[in-house]
Amino acid sequence: MVFVLCIVCALLLGCTFKDYKELLKDSGHGVCFSSKYGKAPFLMNVGIFGLMIVAYFNLAGAIDGRNVWTGMTFGIVFCMLATCNSGSHPGNVWPIMAGYMVTSFLFGGIFKLLGGESYGLTIGSQSILIGLCYANGLSPVVGKYGAFWGMLLAAAHYLLVTAVPDMHGGFCLYNGGFTAALICLLFVPQLERFCKTKEEKKAMKA
């Protein structure tokens, strides 16, 4: 309901589809949406991004056959929303969500093929939903290099986020964000060296 009200308020403030479409084209790198596009498109982003997160969590719960809504998951919804003025929007977050879901299905299937009985890192498990929240920090990279790399980096985050605590002994409470930073440290220099950004690809086609 809160997110629907955000959308209604954005429309009342004069936000148009064209305005929000411009925001969705933004890579999300080093940007403040409310300053660059205005308060109405930013508020529209809060509403649509919020509904997208809730829909994803409900889908994850339906797939797993469990109720995913706990105090922790309510908290991480708002944690994800905290980035919707500083770079995150549905256009650069959906590949991360898709990457998490595909990786969960893939490794869950491999686990069963190897004779495992209970795969603990399913898409609706709390640890994976929390991991997804902080994988959201990869969204500017997705916006800059495209959905394929977003899904690949999300898969790497999924695989590392539950293993990285062994590296720091549980002393880093911001583990998901630390994992996202570690992935950026490993992958972004390679992307900058060997891959073209979406803008560079468009310029080549023009």
Report the location of each language-model feature.
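Transmembrane helix-bundle signature of multi-pass membrane transporters/permeases
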Residues: M80, M101, C133-P140, A155, ...
